[in-house]
A protein has these predicted regions:
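Active-site bordering "gate/hinge" segments
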Residues: 1-202
């Protein structure tokens, strides 16, 4: 199984590299991306930016490093980051993250013995939650930090549940990135952040 995963992943990375080589070796694209839609590290910090948008501005914020879980507890995970905070940084950082993810997966496959007799235990749908409790969880999604908050009542039933999408923080970054820019810069900036429209309302 591990060999099959490696083979498929190598093929994906090879094809992905073909695309990124074309993009990042093209002087016309590079000149269009550089210094477009810049957001400083100070602005990113003040807005509570997360994910690629934060790390492209030099704010090295990543839940996998700050709150490691599962396999991340056994490795010294250090997220990639850049400092220019422009369209180029946000795009190129995604390439660096793909390279890093490839490395992480390959390292994990070294000790992979295949699935056990039971891949995943059957969920206990009748499990009772702790009473009068606030639970918070964090996960690094592909856009950045996702937080889940659940509040239980005196009987252990869910009283309230809230999910915060990373786009809640980063939409304001996009507004800063396009401030004073040409109309033609908007599509580049918008897609360099690649935010969720519905996620802003969660």
């Amino acid at each position: 199984m591990a060999g099959n995963i490696r083979e498929k992943l190598d093929d994906v990375i090879r094809r992905y590299k073909n695309v990124t080589d074309l993009v990042y070796n093209n002087s016309g694209i590079m000149s269009r991306f550089e210094n477009t839609g810049t957001v400083s590290v100070v602005q990113a910090r003040n807005l509570g930016a997360v994910g690629v948008a934060a790390r492209a501005s030099g704010l090295k914020r990543d839940v996998r490093a700050s709150h490691p879980f599962q396999a991340y507890t056994a490795m010294q995970y250090s997220p990639s980051s850049l400092e220019t905070g422009d369209v180029l940084a946000r795009g190129y950082l995604r390439k660096l993250e793909v390279d890093l993810s490839y490395s992480v997966i390959m390292n994990l496959l070294e000790g992979f013995q295949g699935p056990g007799a039971e891949v995943s235990p059957k969920p206990d749908y009748h499990m009772k939650f702790r009473t009068d409790t606030l639970a918070v969880s964090l996960t690094e999604g592909w856009r950045g930090e996702i937080s889940h908050c659940i509040l239980t009542d005196a009987k252990g039933d869910v009283l309230a549940s809230r999910i915060k999408d990373p786009s809640v923080h980063n939409w304001t970054m996009l507004a800063l990135a396009v401030r004073g820019a040409e109309i033609s810069d908007f599509p580049l900036c918008n897609k360099s952040f690649n935010l969720s429209y519905c996620g802003h309302d969660l």
